[in-house]
Amino acid sequence: MRRLFTTLVILLVVLAAGMTALVVLINPNDFRAYMVRQVEMRTGYRLSLDGELRWHVWPQLSILSGNVSVSAPGAATPVINAENMRLDVKLWPLLSHKLEVKQVMLKGAVIRLTPDSEARLASPAPIAPTGPSVPEADTPWHFDINQVEVADSVLVFQRGNAPALNVRDINLTMRSDASRQVQVSLSSRFNRDQRDLSFSLDAVLDMQNYPQQVAADVSSISYQLQGAGLPAEGISGKGTIRGSYQRQPEKLTVNQFALSANNSQLNGALSATFGTVAEYVLTLQSEKLDLDALLGLAHATSSGDGGDKTVIAQPVFSHDQSPEPYQGLRNSIARVAVNAATLVYHGMTVKAFVLKGSNQRGKVSVTDFSGQIGEGHFAIPGTMDVYASPVVSIQPTLTALPLATLLPVFELPDGLDGKLSLQGRLSGNELSRQAFISQWRGSASVQVDQLRLSSLNIQQLIQQAVVRNNSSVRAPDDYSRYTDIQQMSGEATLNAGKLDVQSLSGQSAALTLEGDGQFDLPAQRCDINMNVRVKQGWKGDDQWVQVLQDTAIPLRLYGEFGNLNYQLQVDQGLRKRLQDEMKKRLSDWTEKNQPAAKAPATNP
């Protein structure tokens, strides 16, 4: 046992002595020129190492350096600039003149992917004739890297003249194998426009076709987005992504993604081809797509609820907005297909939602924008031409949509319920609720079935006004607090916030009405004039009851939507009805009592 222990001690001493001798005899600065040459030959980038290289023996044999930078040819700024670098090397390969790096560690690095860091040629260079490549000169050293680690670093990303994006607190680990499969573990965060996104992911990169193509399989990704314009709890989720990046032509493809976002689930694929005109393709499926939770939209509350809407601060953008409207549409081509089993928007639940459309450099066509709300259905195809005026044109077809659900979406007071059907053509220059109610124009045929006017009983207003002025008739003792109209229809014209409804007619078992109305949507005011015939509820003198059932009473409703005033012209209506009745009876009496005209005499 003592001999074995002595042997082990001797081996350790020999090993330590050999390592010490190797480190002493091999100068790490001998690798400087070789590493610079290898990096430039393999990547085209230029490696710069400031200061002396030095050994670090414990706990891992490493080469330490000072400031490190990697630059593209002719670039104004380096792509990578790090405070220090550590190369963890293997001991035994050094004996055979092979520098095998187990890990590259960069700390405090700044990575710039900006126009200033891109390669630039000083002048057009002649193109050499094709031929066999010149073999690399023999060298006693070989250079391999198995792992790269980046800690506490920053990435500056910028495309063209777009604002730069700073990605901070980067912690990245990359491990490669012989088949050029790279395992990646990354965590980072970035802040933009008062919004903070933190994320972490684990992925496998297929580098077999690098640099022309890189494929990625992200097995897990988790994220959290917080800040202005978002719900108080933010947006968070997990998922998986599978895709690839192609260098020439530059194209990003996500073959499949599955992400959760709060209580929403997103599945689909997308691709982006970058060039003079960018081209995007998106296919999205979702079992539930809650836009209220994703976009921080407050649920609209009715005027009678007395509740406050949730106020969500909007972000203050850190860069100037483009003065050219729809610039993104002008410079791109896109195709979009979205299917959601359930979509939530401003508290409104839409089933079987479908969106299909395309953009051809500013000319947008939406062939399908449809869904179900309650028992109703809507389909709103349309077009958008950013070079024309009006910009947007839609052809809505609504069938039996619940009014009580739609009114809060447009921030209109409650008080109406029924099933809205509409068909028409509308156009405008902006896509927003405010623009729709203040700038849009168009016309439509409108019909509302099972209409209910809450807190207003038209039959009660008319009958009680008549009873106060005529003791020959009576009215019911009890009334409901609403008016039910079986069906109401009209022709509507919208003109910059002014809604004019003509040929307005409605009927129910208790009454019929005809008239027209004007609505000021921005001011939320209206002025409606109707002639109403009350067919039920009259009691008393039969002749008076018959007269009242056949008499149209003028009724005017006017004022703010939530505080309507009314004006009844009962006397005028009855007086006109009695005058017409007297004229009719006088005419009938005259015809009956007029002497017969004598026949003309005939000549013999």
Question: Where are these predicted regions, by residue range?
Answer:
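Extended terminal
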Residues: 2-12, 53, 247, 257-259, ...
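Terminal hydrophobic membrane-targeting helix
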Residues: 16-116, 387, 555
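Amphipathic hydrophobic-ligand
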Residues: 45-48, 75-89, 161-172, 191-202, ...
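Solvent-exposed loop/turn tips at the surfaces of repeat/solenoid architectures
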Residues: 68, 104, 109, 148-153, ...
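Secondary-structure transition motifs
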Residues: 68-173, 274-331, 453-480
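Glycine-rich, small/hydroxylated-residue low-complexity segments
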Residues: 101, 185-187, 191, 202-204, ...
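Elongated, acidic membrane-bridging lipid-handling scaffolds
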Residues: 127-223, 317-359
